[in-house]
Regions:
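Short, low-complexity, intrinsically disordered N-terminal peptides in bacterial proteins
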Residues: 1-3, 207-208
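Short beta-edge/loop segments at beta->alpha junctions of small alpha/beta modules
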Residues: 2-78
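Nucleic-acid-binding surface
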Residues: 62-208
Length: 208
C-alpha cells in the first residue's frame, strides 16, 4: 500500500532538507513516490494553498517560503542578484525596490508569481563575475559585489534599457574596481557614465 502523504509532514520535511523551492522530480525522490503521484499531490496542494507555482516545474511553500534572493537564485540558473535589487541591498540607491532583479548568461526572462516578480537580464559570459556568496536571512545567496552591481546597472543604462538614478551613493564604492568591471562590457559609454556619476556626486544635492 502506498504511504499517505500528509501536508504538515511534507512541509516539515521539505524545510528540513532545504527544499523550500523544489521540482516534481525532487519531490518524487524525497518522498519515494512515482512522478505521477508527486505531480498529483503538488497540483492538489496548489489548489488548497499549501504550494505556490513559481514557473513550470518550480514550486515553493506559500506561507513559509524562503528569502526572495534565494528563490531568485534557484528559479533561473545560472544567475546572481544584481542591478536595482543589489544596489538597494548595498545602500547605493536609497529607494526600496519591489521585485527582484538578477543577472544571467541565459535569455532574459521575467516570472510573475503571487509572491513577487523575478526579472533576469542577460549579459555575456565574459562579464558574468563579480558576485559573492552571502548569508541573507539564514540562506546562502549569490549577490553582486557593490561595484559589480553598479557596473551591471550602468551597462543597461548605456543600452537605454533603464534610466540613470540621480541619487546614487558612491561613498563606499571602489572606483578602480568599478572601472575594471565596467571594462568587461567593452562599451566606452559605461566609462563615460562613471565619470558623469562622480561629477554629479560632487554637486549639491537637489531639493525635491
Amino acid at each position: 500500500m502506498a504511504l499517505k502523504l500528509k501536508r504538515i509532514e511534507v512541509e516539515e520535511k521539505l524545510k528540513d532538507l532545504g527544499l523550500e523551492v523544489f521540482t516534481p522530480q525532487e519531490f518524487k525522490g524525497v518522498f519515494n513516490v512515482s512522478l505521477k503521484r508527486a505531480a498529483n499531490f503538488i497540483s492538489s496542494n496548489l489548489r488548497s494553498g499549501l504550494f505556490v507555482k513559481l514557473r513550470n516545474n518550480f514550486y515553493t511553500i506559500k506561507d513559509s517560503h524562503p528569502d526572495y534572493f534565494f528563490i531568485a537564485n534557484k528559479l533561473y540558473q545560472p544567475s546572481y542578484i544584481s542591478l536595482e535589487t543589489a544596489l538597494s541591498y548595498h545602500k547605493i540607491i536609497p529607494e526600496v525596490v519591489y521585485g527582484n532583479t538578477s543577472i544571467t548568461t541565459k535569455t532574459s526572462r521575467e516570472f510573475e508569481t503571487s509572491i513577487g516578480n523575478f526579472t533576469y537580464r542577460h549579459i555575456k559570459t565574459e562579464a558574468f563575475t563579480g558576485y559573492e556568496l552571502r548569508e541573507v536571512d539564514r540562506y546562502k545567496v549569490l549577490i553582486a559585489e557593490p561595484e559589480k552591481a553598479l557596473a551591471d546597472y550602468l551597462y543597461f543604462v548605456d543600452l537605454k534599457k533603464v534610466s540613470l538614478n540621480d541619487r546614487l551613493k558612491l561613498r563606499n564604492i571602489d572606483r578602480s574596481k568599478l572601472i575594471e568591471y565596467a571594462k568587461m562590457f567593452k562599451r566606452p559609454g559605461i566609462l563615460k557614465l562613471i565619470n558623469q556619476i562622480y561629477v554629479d556626486a560632487r554637486k549639491p544635492p537637489k531639493i525635491y
